[in-house]
A protein has these predicted regions:
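Conserved pre-catalytic core of RNA-dependent polymerases
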Residues: 2-4, 8-13, 17-19, 24-161
C-alpha cells in the first residue's frame, strides 16, 4: 500500500511540473517517461495520440480559444463548431486511414508601420486542429532539448522575456 501511495505522490508532482502539457494526451505514465528518459530514446505509437478523438477534441478546444479567421475555405470557428463532433470524428478517421489532405493556406498581407506589407498564411480550421494535435504530442518531447536562451514559439516564453 505504501508503494502505491508513493507512486501516486510522485505522479502528482510530475503532473505539476508538466502542467503546461495537454492532459488529454499525456498520461502520468508518459510524463514519467519524459522525466526519466525513454529507453533507447525512441518513442513508439505517437500517431495514435494525434489521431485519437480525445486528442483532436483537446486540439479543437485550443483552436477555439485562439479564434482567428477562416482559411482558404472561409470556414469560421463558429461554423466548424456547429458540427464539431461529427467533423472531429471524420478528421480522426481521415488521419487514421491516410486520406487526410491539408488545404492550401489563405495568403493575406498585413500592413507594417513602415508602409510595407507582411505576408501571413491562414490555415483552414481543420488544419489548425491537426497542427495543434501534432504540437500537443511533439512539443513536450522536444521542449527540454531546446536552448534555454531560445524564446520564440515556446510554451511560457515570449520575445519580451
Amino acid at each position: 500500500m505504501e508503494v502505491a501511495v508513493e507512486r501516486s505522490k510522485q505522479a502528482g508532482e510530475i503532473r505539476v511540473r508538466w502542467a503546461w502539457v495537454e492532459p488529454m494526451v499525456w498520461t502520468d505514465r508518459m510524463l514519467a517517461a519524459l522525466e526519466t528518459g525513454v529507453q533507447g530514446g525512441v518513442w513508439f505509437s505517437l500517431i495514435d495520440k494525434v489521431t485519437s478523438l480525445r486528442g483532436l477534441r483537446a486540439a479543437w478546444g485550443q483552436v477555439q480559444r485562439n479564434q482567428g479567421s477562416g482559411g482558404v475555405d472561409r470556414e469560421t470557428i463558429d461554423q466548424f463548431g456547429r458540427e464539431a463532433g461529427s467533423r472531429l470524428s471524420k478528421l480522426s478517421e481521415q488521419l487514421k486511414n491516410g486520406t487526410y489532405q491539408p488545404l492550401p493556406v489563405r495568403r493575406v498581407y498585413i500592413p507594417k508601420p513602415d508602409g510595407k506589407k507582411r505576408p501571413l498564411g491562414i490555415p483552414a480550421v481543420r488544419d489548425r486542429i491537426v497542427q495543434a494535435a501534432v504540437r500537443n504530442v511533439l512539443e513536450p518531447i522536444f521542449e527540454w532539448e531546446f536552448c534555454e536562451h531560445s524564446y520564440g514559439f515556446r510554451p511560457g516564453r515570449g520575445a519580451k522575456d
